[in-house]
C-alpha cells in the first residue's frame, strides 16, 4: 500500500485494488488490519504449498490476461541492496510480480502475495484507454475471485467491489483523479501543499525540490 507520508507529499500515484481472503464472520476492517500486519513482518521460512499456490494463481492470471508476464527477480542483487544473505532476500521478497509486456502497456502491475493480490494502475489514462485498462483489471481479478475465493477491496471507493458491476464507478473515480492531477491550474498541488501544512506545519524550504539529494 502507498504509505501515508508518500501520499501527503506526492498524492496517490496509482489506483489500487487489494484482493483478500475474507473468512466467514470476518469484517472488512478485520481483513484489512490483518493485511497491514502481514505486510509489516517477515513471514518466516518459505512454505512449499503456499509457493505452489502462488505460482498456480499467477499462471491463472497470465492465462486470463496473456499480456502479463512474471518479472524475474535477481535475488543476488536484491540481497546486496538489502545487505542480507540471498536466502533471506528470497524469503522476504517472496511475492510474484506480473507486468504487462511489452512495457509500458497501461502500466498495470499485479503482485501475488502469500494470502492476497495487489493490482495497481497509474493515473495516466482517460477515455478509451482508461476503459481498456479497467477491462484488463477485471480480467486479472476474475481467476482470483472465481477460482480462489478472494474478495476485492477498493480503497478509493472505501468498500468491497464486484466486477464487472462496479467498473463504471471505479473508472469515474479514476478519471476524476487523473483530471485533478493534470489540472493546469495546479489545484491538486495546492491541495496537497495545504494538507502537508495541516499535518506538519509550514516547513521552510532551503532547496529547490530537484536538489533533494544535495
Task: Give residue spans per PLM region.
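Acidic (Asp/Glu-rich) sequence patches and key acidic residues
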Residues: 7-214
Amino acid at each position: 500500500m502507498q504509505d501515508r507520508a508518500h501520499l501527503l507529499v506526492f498524492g496517490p500515484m496509482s489506483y489500487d485494488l487489494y484482493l483478500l481472503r475474507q473468512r466467514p464472520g470476518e469484517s472488512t476492517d478485520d481483513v484489512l488490519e490483518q493485511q497491514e500486519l502481514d505486510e509489516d513482518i517477515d513471514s518466516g521460512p518459505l512454505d512449499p504449498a503456499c509457493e505452489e499456490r502462488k505460482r498456480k494463481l499467477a499462471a491463472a492470471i497470465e492465462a486470463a490476461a496473456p499480456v502479463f508476464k512474471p518479472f524475474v527477480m535477481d535475488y543476488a542483487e536484491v540481497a546486496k541492496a538489502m545487505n542480507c544473505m540471498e536466502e533471506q532476500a528470497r524469503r522476504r521478497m517472496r511475492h510474484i510480480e506480473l507486468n504487462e509486456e511489452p512495457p509500458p502497456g497501461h502500466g498495470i502491475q499485479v503482485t501475488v502475495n502469500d494470502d492476497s493480490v495487489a493490482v495497481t494502475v497509474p493515473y495516466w489514462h482517460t477515455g478509451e484507454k482508461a476503459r481498456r485498462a479497467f477491462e484488463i483489471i477485471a480480467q486479472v481479478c476474475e481467476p482470483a475471485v472465481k477460482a480462489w475465493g478472494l474478495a476485492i477491496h477498493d480503497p478509493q471507493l472505501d468498500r468491497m467491489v464486484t466486477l464487472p458491476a462496479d467498473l463504471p464507478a471505479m473508472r469515474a473515480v479514476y478519471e476524476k483523479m487523473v483530471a485533478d492531477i493534470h489540472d493546469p491550474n495546479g489545484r491538486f498541488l495546492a491541495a496537497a501543499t495545504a494538507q502537508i501544512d495541516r499535518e506538519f506545519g509550514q516547513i521552510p524550504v532551503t532547496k529547490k525540490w530537484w536538489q533533494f539529494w544535495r
